[in-house]
Amino acid sequence: MSADTATAGVASRLAAARVLTAVFDQGRSLKAELAATLPGIGDPRDRALVEAICFAVIRRRPAYEVALRQWLERALPPRDAELKALLMVGFAQLEVLQLPAHAALSATVDACRALGRPRQAGMVNAILRRAQREGFPAVADDAGWPSWLRKQLRADWGDRAEAIFTASAQMAPMWLRVQRSRTDPATYVARLAELDIVAHTDAVLPDAVRLHNAVPVSQLPGFAEGDVSVQDGSAQQVADALTLAPSARVLDACAAPGGKAAHLLERHPGLQLVALDVDARRLERVQQTLQRTVPNALVALQAADAADTDAWWDGRPFDAVLLDAPCSATGVVRRQPDVLLHRRADDIEALCALQARLLDATWRTLRPGGQLLYTTCSLLARENQAQVEAFLQRTPDARAQTLGAQFGHAAGAGRQRFPGEQHCDGFFYALLLKAS
Protein backbone atom coordinates (compact mmCIF):
# COMPACT_ATOMS: atom_id res chain seq x y z
CA MET A 1 0.00 0.00 0.00
CA SER A 2 1.40 3.40 -0.99
CA ALA A 3 1.65 6.28 1.46
CA ASP A 4 -0.95 8.20 -0.55
CA THR A 5 -3.36 5.27 -0.40
CA ALA A 6 -2.87 4.91 3.35
CA THR A 7 -3.42 8.63 3.86
CA ALA A 8 -6.61 8.52 1.78
CA GLY A 9 -7.80 5.53 3.80
CA VAL A 10 -7.36 7.40 7.06
CA ALA A 11 -9.04 10.49 5.65
CA SER A 12 -12.03 8.42 4.51
CA ARG A 13 -12.54 6.95 7.99
CA LEU A 14 -12.21 10.38 9.57
CA ALA A 15 -14.71 11.86 7.11
CA ALA A 16 -17.22 9.10 7.85
CA ALA A 17 -16.82 9.59 11.61
CA ARG A 18 -17.40 13.32 11.30
CA VAL A 19 -20.49 12.89 9.13
CA LEU A 20 -21.89 10.41 11.65
CA THR A 21 -21.15 12.71 14.58
CA ALA A 22 -23.09 15.48 12.86
CA VAL A 23 -26.02 13.11 12.28
CA PHE A 24 -26.03 11.49 15.73
CA ASP A 25 -25.13 14.41 17.96
CA GLN A 26 -26.12 17.54 16.05
CA GLY A 27 -29.36 16.32 14.47
CA ARG A 28 -28.09 16.89 10.94
CA SER A 29 -29.47 15.12 7.89
CA LEU A 30 -27.30 12.32 6.51
CA LYS A 31 -28.10 13.42 2.96
CA ALA A 32 -27.07 17.01 3.68
CA GLU A 33 -23.87 16.02 5.46
CA LEU A 34 -22.82 13.68 2.67
CA ALA A 35 -23.62 16.35 0.09
CA ALA A 36 -21.31 18.73 1.96
CA THR A 37 -18.54 16.18 2.53
CA LEU A 38 -18.25 13.98 -0.55
CA PRO A 39 -17.31 16.67 -3.11
CA GLY A 40 -14.15 17.31 -1.10
CA ILE A 41 -12.98 13.71 -1.53
CA GLY A 42 -11.11 13.28 -4.79
CA ASP A 43 -11.20 9.55 -5.49
CA PRO A 44 -14.69 8.24 -6.34
CA ARG A 45 -13.80 4.97 -4.59
CA ASP A 46 -13.15 6.85 -1.37
CA ARG A 47 -16.41 8.78 -1.76
CA ALA A 48 -18.26 5.49 -2.21
CA LEU A 49 -16.53 4.06 0.88
CA VAL A 50 -17.51 7.01 3.08
CA GLU A 51 -21.12 6.79 1.93
CA ALA A 52 -21.28 3.02 2.42
CA ILE A 53 -19.79 3.25 5.92
CA CYS A 54 -22.24 5.96 6.99
CA PHE A 55 -25.30 4.06 5.80
CA ALA A 56 -24.07 0.83 7.37
CA VAL A 57 -23.38 2.44 10.75
CA ILE A 58 -26.78 4.13 10.95
CA ARG A 59 -28.58 0.90 10.05
CA ARG A 60 -26.60 -1.14 12.56
CA ARG A 61 -26.28 1.47 15.30
CA PRO A 62 -28.56 -0.36 17.80
CA ALA A 63 -26.29 -3.43 17.74
CA TYR A 64 -23.15 -1.32 17.89
CA GLU A 65 -24.46 0.60 20.90
CA VAL A 66 -25.08 -2.68 22.74
CA ALA A 67 -21.59 -3.91 21.84
CA LEU A 68 -19.94 -0.74 23.14
CA ARG A 69 -21.85 -0.94 26.41
CA GLN A 70 -20.58 -4.49 26.85
CA TRP A 71 -16.99 -3.95 25.76
CA LEU A 72 -16.05 -0.54 27.16
CA GLU A 73 -15.03 -0.36 30.81
CA ARG A 74 -16.88 2.95 31.07
CA ALA A 75 -19.14 4.81 28.68
CA LEU A 76 -17.49 7.43 26.50
CA PRO A 77 -18.42 10.98 27.58
CA PRO A 78 -20.21 13.33 25.16
CA ARG A 79 -16.94 15.08 24.31
CA ASP A 80 -15.78 11.79 22.75
CA ALA A 81 -18.62 11.68 20.21
CA GLU A 82 -16.22 11.54 17.24
CA LEU A 83 -14.22 8.75 18.88
CA LYS A 84 -17.40 6.75 19.46
CA ALA A 85 -18.44 7.30 15.85
CA LEU A 86 -14.99 6.16 14.72
CA LEU A 87 -15.38 2.90 16.64
CA MET A 88 -18.65 2.33 14.81
CA VAL A 89 -16.90 3.12 11.53
CA GLY A 90 -14.53 0.28 12.34
CA PHE A 91 -17.42 -2.03 13.22
CA ALA A 92 -19.17 -1.38 9.91
CA GLN A 93 -16.01 -2.11 7.93
CA LEU A 94 -15.66 -5.48 9.62
CA GLU A 95 -19.29 -6.56 9.76
CA VAL A 96 -21.17 -4.99 6.86
CA LEU A 97 -18.57 -4.06 4.27
CA GLN A 98 -16.42 -7.06 5.23
CA LEU A 99 -13.20 -5.29 4.34
CA PRO A 100 -9.93 -7.11 5.05
CA ALA A 101 -9.49 -6.92 8.81
CA HIS A 102 -5.90 -5.69 8.70
CA ALA A 103 -6.85 -2.78 6.43
CA ALA A 104 -9.94 -1.85 8.46
CA LEU A 105 -8.09 -1.97 11.78
CA SER A 106 -4.99 -0.18 10.56
CA ALA A 107 -6.84 2.69 8.89
CA THR A 108 -9.26 3.15 11.80
CA VAL A 109 -6.52 3.13 14.45
CA ASP A 110 -4.50 5.61 12.38
CA ALA A 111 -7.64 7.74 12.07
CA CYS A 112 -7.86 7.77 15.86
CA ARG A 113 -4.36 9.23 16.00
CA ALA A 114 -5.23 11.74 13.26
CA LEU A 115 -8.24 12.72 15.35
CA GLY A 116 -5.77 13.93 17.95
CA ARG A 117 -6.43 11.01 20.30
CA PRO A 118 -3.20 8.94 20.15
CA ARG A 119 -3.67 7.67 23.72
CA GLN A 120 -6.95 6.04 22.66
CA ALA A 121 -5.43 4.17 19.71
CA GLY A 122 -4.74 1.08 21.82
CA MET A 123 -8.31 1.00 23.08
CA VAL A 124 -9.68 1.35 19.54
CA ASN A 125 -7.44 -1.48 18.34
CA ALA A 126 -8.51 -3.74 21.22
CA ILE A 127 -12.24 -3.07 20.74
CA LEU A 128 -12.05 -3.70 16.99
CA ARG A 129 -10.14 -6.94 17.52
CA ARG A 130 -12.78 -8.07 19.98
CA ALA A 131 -15.47 -7.27 17.43
CA GLN A 132 -13.53 -9.29 14.88
CA ARG A 133 -13.38 -12.28 17.25
CA GLU A 134 -16.84 -12.20 18.80
CA GLY A 135 -19.14 -10.55 16.28
CA PHE A 136 -22.04 -8.39 17.39
CA PRO A 137 -25.01 -9.00 19.68
CA ALA A 138 -28.32 -9.78 18.06
CA VAL A 139 -30.92 -7.02 18.22
CA ALA A 140 -34.54 -6.99 17.07
CA ASP A 141 -35.29 -5.52 13.65
CA ASP A 142 -37.35 -2.79 15.30
CA ALA A 143 -34.60 -1.80 17.75
CA GLY A 144 -33.77 1.42 15.92
CA TRP A 145 -37.38 2.59 15.64
CA PRO A 146 -38.71 5.14 18.16
CA SER A 147 -41.20 3.52 20.52
CA TRP A 148 -44.06 5.81 19.42
CA LEU A 149 -43.49 4.83 15.79
CA ARG A 150 -43.27 1.11 16.54
CA LYS A 151 -46.56 1.38 18.41
CA GLN A 152 -48.23 3.31 15.59
CA LEU A 153 -47.16 0.91 12.86
CA ARG A 154 -48.40 -2.06 14.87
CA ALA A 155 -51.70 -0.27 15.42
CA ASP A 156 -52.01 0.52 11.71
CA TRP A 157 -50.84 -2.79 10.27
CA GLY A 158 -50.98 -5.46 12.97
CA ASP A 159 -48.75 -8.46 12.33
CA ARG A 160 -47.54 -6.95 9.05
CA ALA A 161 -45.53 -4.42 11.06
CA GLU A 162 -42.85 -7.02 11.81
CA ALA A 163 -42.21 -7.50 8.09
CA ILE A 164 -41.97 -3.72 7.74
CA PHE A 165 -39.25 -3.57 10.40
CA THR A 166 -37.34 -6.46 8.83
CA ALA A 167 -37.49 -5.06 5.30
CA SER A 168 -36.57 -1.56 6.45
CA ALA A 169 -33.36 -2.88 8.01
CA GLN A 170 -32.10 -4.01 4.61
CA MET A 171 -30.21 -2.06 1.98
CA ALA A 172 -32.45 -0.84 -0.84
CA PRO A 173 -31.57 -1.83 -4.41
CA MET A 174 -30.66 0.73 -7.05
CA TRP A 175 -33.48 1.21 -9.54
CA LEU A 176 -33.08 2.93 -12.90
CA ARG A 177 -35.66 4.29 -15.32
CA VAL A 178 -34.77 4.24 -19.00
CA GLN A 179 -36.02 6.86 -21.42
CA ARG A 180 -37.98 4.92 -24.03
CA SER A 181 -37.29 7.40 -26.81
CA ARG A 182 -33.60 6.55 -26.46
CA THR A 183 -33.44 2.90 -25.39
CA ASP A 184 -35.39 0.11 -23.69
CA PRO A 185 -34.76 -1.88 -20.49
CA ALA A 186 -33.50 -5.06 -22.19
CA THR A 187 -31.07 -3.14 -24.39
CA TYR A 188 -29.82 -1.12 -21.44
CA VAL A 189 -29.32 -4.25 -19.33
CA ALA A 190 -27.14 -5.58 -22.17
CA ARG A 191 -25.12 -2.32 -22.19
CA LEU A 192 -24.57 -2.70 -18.45
CA ALA A 193 -23.50 -6.32 -18.88
CA GLU A 194 -20.72 -5.18 -21.21
CA LEU A 195 -19.40 -3.19 -18.23
CA ASP A 196 -19.82 -6.19 -15.87
CA ILE A 197 -22.74 -4.49 -14.10
CA VAL A 198 -25.43 -7.07 -13.30
CA ALA A 199 -28.99 -5.79 -13.78
CA HIS A 200 -32.52 -7.03 -14.42
CA THR A 201 -35.65 -5.84 -16.18
CA ASP A 202 -38.98 -5.91 -14.34
CA ALA A 203 -42.21 -7.65 -15.34
CA VAL A 204 -44.46 -4.96 -13.80
CA LEU A 205 -42.51 -1.75 -14.39
CA PRO A 206 -42.12 -1.20 -18.14
CA ASP A 207 -39.32 1.38 -17.97
CA ALA A 208 -37.36 -0.11 -15.07
CA VAL A 209 -33.95 -1.69 -14.62
CA ARG A 210 -32.85 -2.97 -11.21
CA LEU A 211 -29.15 -3.29 -10.40
CA HIS A 212 -27.76 -6.16 -8.37
CA ASN A 213 -25.30 -3.75 -6.73
CA ALA A 214 -25.43 0.04 -6.69
CA VAL A 215 -22.87 1.96 -8.73
CA PRO A 216 -22.04 5.67 -9.02
CA VAL A 217 -24.08 7.38 -11.72
CA SER A 218 -20.81 8.27 -13.44
CA GLN A 219 -20.52 4.56 -14.31
CA LEU A 220 -23.97 4.40 -15.93
CA PRO A 221 -23.68 4.59 -19.72
CA GLY A 222 -25.76 7.40 -21.17
CA PHE A 223 -26.67 8.95 -17.82
CA ALA A 224 -25.36 12.40 -18.70
CA GLU A 225 -27.20 12.24 -22.03
CA GLY A 226 -30.53 11.44 -20.37
CA ASP A 227 -30.78 7.80 -21.45
CA VAL A 228 -31.39 6.72 -17.87
CA SER A 229 -32.29 8.15 -14.47
CA VAL A 230 -32.16 6.83 -10.91
CA GLN A 231 -35.68 6.31 -9.57
CA ASP A 232 -37.19 3.71 -7.26
CA GLY A 233 -39.79 1.39 -8.72
CA SER A 234 -42.56 2.75 -6.51
CA ALA A 235 -41.95 6.28 -7.77
CA GLN A 236 -41.93 5.03 -11.36
CA GLN A 237 -45.49 3.77 -10.97
CA VAL A 238 -46.77 7.32 -10.58
CA ALA A 239 -46.67 7.64 -14.37
CA ASP A 240 -48.76 4.46 -14.69
CA ALA A 241 -51.51 5.76 -12.41
CA LEU A 242 -52.42 8.90 -14.37
CA THR A 243 -54.32 8.78 -17.67
CA LEU A 244 -53.25 11.84 -19.66
CA ALA A 245 -54.24 13.30 -23.01
CA PRO A 246 -51.27 14.14 -25.29
CA SER A 247 -51.33 17.89 -24.55
CA ALA A 248 -52.78 17.79 -21.04
CA ARG A 249 -52.05 20.62 -18.63
CA VAL A 250 -50.52 19.05 -15.52
CA LEU A 251 -49.47 20.38 -12.11
CA ASP A 252 -46.65 18.73 -10.19
CA ALA A 253 -47.28 20.43 -6.87
CA CYS A 254 -44.19 19.29 -4.91
CA ALA A 255 -41.83 18.54 -7.76
CA ALA A 256 -38.32 18.24 -6.31
CA PRO A 257 -36.09 16.50 -7.18
CA GLY A 258 -37.88 16.18 -10.52
CA GLY A 259 -37.88 12.47 -11.29
CA LYS A 260 -41.65 12.08 -11.51
CA ALA A 261 -42.04 15.19 -13.67
CA ALA A 262 -39.33 13.93 -16.01
CA HIS A 263 -40.99 10.52 -16.27
CA LEU A 264 -44.36 12.06 -17.13
CA LEU A 265 -42.73 14.18 -19.83
CA GLU A 266 -40.81 11.21 -21.21
CA ARG A 267 -44.08 9.29 -21.49
CA HIS A 268 -46.08 12.28 -22.81
CA PRO A 269 -43.77 14.74 -24.61
CA GLY A 270 -46.62 17.16 -25.40
CA LEU A 271 -47.64 17.81 -21.80
CA GLN A 272 -47.86 21.37 -20.52
CA LEU A 273 -46.34 20.95 -17.08
CA VAL A 274 -46.22 23.40 -14.20
CA ALA A 275 -43.73 22.24 -11.57
CA LEU A 276 -43.71 23.85 -8.13
CA ASP A 277 -41.53 23.50 -5.10
CA VAL A 278 -41.52 25.65 -1.99
CA ASP A 279 -37.70 25.46 -1.82
CA ALA A 280 -35.96 27.42 -4.58
CA ARG A 281 -32.74 25.44 -4.16
CA ARG A 282 -34.59 22.16 -4.58
CA LEU A 283 -36.29 23.60 -7.65
CA GLU A 284 -32.83 24.01 -9.18
CA ARG A 285 -32.52 20.22 -8.91
CA VAL A 286 -35.76 19.88 -10.85
CA GLN A 287 -34.43 22.17 -13.55
CA GLN A 288 -31.19 20.19 -13.81
CA THR A 289 -33.09 16.90 -14.01
CA LEU A 290 -35.42 18.14 -16.73
CA GLN A 291 -32.58 19.74 -18.69
CA ARG A 292 -30.71 16.43 -18.71
CA THR A 293 -33.69 14.23 -19.59
CA VAL A 294 -36.29 16.31 -21.49
CA PRO A 295 -34.59 19.57 -22.54
CA ASN A 296 -37.30 20.48 -25.07
CA ALA A 297 -40.30 19.92 -22.81
CA LEU A 298 -42.93 22.59 -22.13
CA VAL A 299 -42.34 23.23 -18.42
CA ALA A 300 -42.97 26.23 -16.19
CA LEU A 301 -40.94 26.07 -12.97
CA GLN A 302 -42.04 28.16 -10.00
CA ALA A 303 -40.64 28.43 -6.49
CA ALA A 304 -43.93 28.60 -4.62
CA ASP A 305 -46.01 27.04 -1.88
CA ALA A 306 -48.64 25.00 -3.70
CA ALA A 307 -51.07 25.62 -0.83
CA ASP A 308 -50.94 29.39 -1.47
CA THR A 309 -52.67 29.42 -4.85
CA ASP A 310 -53.04 33.22 -4.86
CA ALA A 311 -49.26 33.47 -5.12
CA TRP A 312 -48.76 31.31 -8.20
CA TRP A 313 -51.95 30.12 -9.96
CA ASP A 314 -53.13 32.06 -13.01
CA GLY A 315 -56.65 30.63 -12.80
CA ARG A 316 -56.33 28.24 -15.73
CA PRO A 317 -57.45 24.80 -14.54
CA PHE A 318 -55.31 21.71 -14.77
CA ASP A 319 -56.33 18.42 -16.36
CA ALA A 320 -54.34 16.50 -13.77
CA VAL A 321 -52.53 17.18 -10.51
CA LEU A 322 -49.71 15.15 -8.99
CA LEU A 323 -49.47 15.81 -5.25
CA ASP A 324 -46.47 13.90 -3.93
CA ALA A 325 -46.96 15.31 -0.47
CA PRO A 326 -44.35 16.00 2.22
CA CYS A 327 -44.58 13.15 4.71
CA SER A 328 -42.87 11.20 7.48
CA ALA A 329 -40.75 9.21 4.96
CA THR A 330 -41.37 6.06 6.99
CA GLY A 331 -41.57 4.02 3.79
CA VAL A 332 -38.02 4.88 2.70
CA VAL A 333 -36.07 4.07 5.86
CA ARG A 334 -33.96 1.69 3.75
CA ARG A 335 -32.71 4.72 1.79
CA GLN A 336 -32.89 7.31 4.57
CA PRO A 337 -32.07 5.42 7.78
CA ASP A 338 -31.54 8.65 9.71
CA VAL A 339 -35.31 9.24 9.48
CA LEU A 340 -35.54 7.04 12.58
CA LEU A 341 -33.14 9.33 14.44
CA HIS A 342 -34.81 12.62 13.60
CA ARG A 343 -38.54 11.97 13.23
CA ARG A 344 -40.65 13.06 16.23
CA ALA A 345 -44.23 12.16 17.13
CA ASP A 346 -45.40 15.78 16.94
CA ASP A 347 -44.06 15.99 13.36
CA ILE A 348 -46.98 13.85 12.20
CA GLU A 349 -49.66 16.30 13.25
CA ALA A 350 -47.91 19.12 11.42
CA LEU A 351 -47.38 16.99 8.32
CA CYS A 352 -51.03 15.90 8.27
CA ALA A 353 -52.18 19.51 8.51
CA LEU A 354 -49.88 20.46 5.62
CA GLN A 355 -51.08 17.54 3.50
CA ALA A 356 -54.71 18.56 4.07
CA ARG A 357 -53.97 22.16 3.05
CA LEU A 358 -52.22 20.97 -0.10
CA LEU A 359 -55.08 18.66 -1.02
CA ASP A 360 -57.69 21.37 -0.59
CA ALA A 361 -55.68 24.01 -2.44
CA THR A 362 -54.59 21.93 -5.42
CA TRP A 363 -58.10 20.47 -5.78
CA ARG A 364 -59.34 23.99 -6.52
CA THR A 365 -56.95 24.20 -9.48
CA LEU A 366 -58.27 20.99 -11.07
CA ARG A 367 -60.87 21.11 -13.85
CA PRO A 368 -64.13 19.16 -13.55
CA GLY A 369 -63.45 15.64 -14.76
CA GLY A 370 -59.76 15.96 -13.91
CA GLN A 371 -57.63 13.60 -11.83
CA LEU A 372 -55.55 14.21 -8.72
CA LEU A 373 -52.99 11.60 -7.72
CA TYR A 374 -52.07 11.83 -4.04
CA THR A 375 -48.89 9.98 -3.10
CA THR A 376 -46.58 9.71 -0.11
CA CYS A 377 -43.60 7.59 0.88
CA SER A 378 -45.23 7.08 4.30
CA LEU A 379 -46.53 3.94 5.98
CA LEU A 380 -48.75 5.77 8.47
CA ALA A 381 -52.53 5.56 8.03
CA ARG A 382 -52.98 9.14 9.29
CA GLU A 383 -50.99 10.46 6.34
CA ASN A 384 -52.46 8.05 3.83
CA GLN A 385 -55.85 6.34 3.90
CA ALA A 386 -57.18 8.45 6.80
CA GLN A 387 -56.00 11.64 5.11
CA VAL A 388 -57.76 10.71 1.87
CA GLU A 389 -60.94 9.62 3.65
CA ALA A 390 -61.14 12.95 5.49
CA PHE A 391 -60.66 14.78 2.20
CA LEU A 392 -63.42 12.79 0.51
CA GLN A 393 -65.79 13.52 3.38
CA ARG A 394 -65.30 17.29 3.17
CA THR A 395 -65.14 17.48 -0.65
CA PRO A 396 -68.49 16.66 -2.27
CA ASP A 397 -67.17 16.73 -5.87
CA ALA A 398 -64.38 14.22 -5.17
CA ARG A 399 -64.53 10.47 -5.53
CA ALA A 400 -61.87 7.80 -5.43
CA GLN A 401 -60.90 5.78 -8.47
CA THR A 402 -59.75 2.20 -8.08
CA LEU A 403 -56.09 1.40 -8.69
CA GLY A 404 -55.00 -2.13 -9.51
CA ALA A 405 -53.19 -4.60 -7.28
CA GLN A 406 -49.88 -3.73 -8.98
CA PHE A 407 -49.91 -0.59 -6.81
CA GLY A 408 -49.95 -2.56 -3.56
CA HIS A 409 -52.49 -3.54 -0.95
CA ALA A 410 -55.94 -1.99 -0.61
CA ALA A 411 -55.80 0.75 2.03
CA GLY A 412 -59.03 2.70 2.32
CA ALA A 413 -59.54 4.59 -0.93
CA GLY A 414 -55.92 4.02 -1.96
CA ARG A 415 -53.16 1.45 -2.24
CA GLN A 416 -50.22 0.85 0.07
CA ARG A 417 -46.98 -0.81 -0.93
CA PHE A 418 -44.76 -1.95 1.92
CA PRO A 419 -40.95 -1.72 1.91
CA GLY A 420 -39.28 -4.54 0.03
CA GLU A 421 -42.36 -5.65 -1.88
CA GLN A 422 -41.36 -6.04 -5.54
CA HIS A 423 -37.95 -4.80 -4.25
CA CYS A 424 -39.52 -1.31 -4.00
CA ASP A 425 -39.85 1.39 -1.35
CA GLY A 426 -42.92 1.82 0.82
CA PHE A 427 -45.38 4.07 -1.00
CA PHE A 428 -49.04 5.12 -0.94
CA TYR A 429 -51.21 6.02 -3.95
CA ALA A 430 -54.75 7.42 -4.11
CA LEU A 431 -56.34 8.53 -7.39
CA LEU A 432 -59.18 11.05 -7.04
CA LEU A 433 -61.61 12.17 -9.75
CA LYS A 434 -63.33 15.56 -9.77
CA ALA A 435 -67.00 15.40 -10.75
CA SER A 436 -67.85 16.84 -14.18
From Swiss-Prot:
A molecular function (GO) term: RNA binding
S-adenosyl-L-methionine keyword on record: yes
GO annotations of cellular component type: cytosol
Keyword Methyltransferase recorded: yes
Entry-linked CDD domains: AdoMet_MTases
Binding annotation for S-adenosyl-L-methionine: 254-260, 277, 305, 324
Enzyme class: transferase
Family per record: Belongs to the class I-like SAM-binding methyltransferase superfamily. RsmB/NOP family.
UniProt function note: Specifically methylates the cytosine at position 967 (m5C967) of 16S rRNA.
Protein's UniProt name: Ribosomal RNA small subunit methyltransferase B
